[in-house]
Amino acid sequence: MNKTAIYPGTFDPITYGHLDIITRATKIFDSITIAISNNFTKKPIFNLKERIELTRKVTLHLKNVKKILGFNDLLANLAKKEKANILIRGVRTIFDFDYEIKLAAINKQIYPDLDSIFLLSSKEVSFISSSFVKEIAKYKGDIKPYLPKEAHSALLRKLNNDSIK
């Protein structure tokens, strides 16, 4: 049986934490679709096209990543449209788990064939979040340990351009 899964997120920017989950998921599933949310409530630094391109560059070496797309819909609706019945979710803390278990129940109610698989973040990256990285970068802190080089360069360029305007 071909196992296809969706890994959704905002990826603003993609971090080593995201890459940890994606890399490990490619060892479990035959095909991974990375779905990048166009969630304006999060006020992303990068636009959707930039986040898709950064994610593509960072995951090029992962052959099981078959598709990277943006979406502006309920996740369950996207999964149904993409004919995927597995959602991959990374969990760092008990607070993440509490949120994710509620989200999984709602998604299951909307799309009964959809199951959520939770992968615990590796301990080396379990504290990384895009929000923390952006905060560190805004105050000129070192963000290299948290981001793949493409995302690191892009974030520094973006912050420098924004401060010039």
UniProtKB/Swiss-Prot annotation:
A matching Pfam family: CTP_transf_like
Residues holding ATP: 10-11, 18, 90-92, 100, 125-131
Reactions catalysed according to its record: (R)-4'-phosphopantetheine + ATP + H(+) = 3'-dephospho-CoA + diphosphate
Coiled coil: none
Keyword set, alphabetical order: ATP-binding, Coenzyme A biosynthesis, Cytoplasm, Magnesium, Nucleotide-binding, Nucleotidyltransferase, Transferase
Entry binding sites for substrate: 10, 42, 75, 89
Main location: cytoplasm
Alphabetical list of InterPro entries matching this protein: Cyt_trans-like, PPAT, Rossmann-like_a/b/a_fold
The protein's required cofactors: Mg(2+)
Top-level taxon in the UniProt lineage: Bacteria
EC number(s) stated in the UniProt entry for this protein: 2.7.7.3
Subcellular localization, as worded in the UniProt entry: Cytoplasm
Role of this protein: Reversibly transfers an adenylyl group from ATP to 4'-phosphopantetheine, yielding dephospho-CoA (dPCoA) and pyrophosphate.
Assembly: Homohexamer.
Family: Belongs to the bacterial CoaD family.
Record's protein name: Phosphopantetheine adenylyltransferase
